[in-house]
Amino acid sequence: EQKEKYRELSQKLSLLTLQFSENCLKETNDYLKVITDSTLLSGLPESAITAAKETAQEKGVEGWAFTLHAPSYVPVMTYADNRDLRKEIYMAYNTQCTHDNEHNNLDVVKELANTRMEVAQLLGYKDYASYMLEDRMAQNSEAVYNLLNQLLDAYTPTAKNEYAEVQALARKEAGSGFELMPWDWSYYSNKLKNEKYQINDEML
């Protein structure tokens, strides 16, 4: 009976995982940001502008079209001078599958978490992480958290220094009251890299 229950739960997990992935893919493929004002393209490398023009032609729209796929998304976040454009694309990318449509993954995630807990309890574990980690190097979730805390302690000073540098550059360019937001990070960190080392991501 336990084996049969485990088989049912495993099959359910597989289907939920597949549904989650398919929803993400569909949401990504459905998104299209169309731009007809060329001034919004300021800062973008020629390769990204050309690709956006080709995407627009493929989709049968005027102007330039951007998607949430990495070759389109990354250049906007890294090079687009227009902050509102960066924010719009960033928010679209990071809120995928949370909207009120057929691709919403919120219920899928809840069902995944509940089913994983069922599997763990069926097999005598306190949670799914303990079940998954038993045969791995970490062995349990406590060991994972200990390692993460060690990494946090080790890298926090460096991260704070890097953030301060990027924030300082942003304020130098955009004004003393400028507050760095997630959609600004790639843009200004790339500028800082270029300023310090005369190199940027496009060159790489």
Task: Specify the residue positions occupied by each region the protein language model found.
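Active-site-proximal, well-structured secondary-structure segments within enzyme catalytic domains
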Residues: 4-7, 11-67, 110, 115, ...
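Active-site-adjacent "gating/activation" loops or surface patches in catalytic cores
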Residues: 58-97, 185, 190-192
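Second-shell loop/turn segments in exported
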Residues: 72-79, 97-102, 133-144, 203
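Short, 15-30-residue, compositionally biased linear elements
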Residues: 77, 103-115
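Surface-exposed loop/turn segments and immediately adjacent short secondary-structure elements
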Residues: 85, 89, 101-102, 118, ...
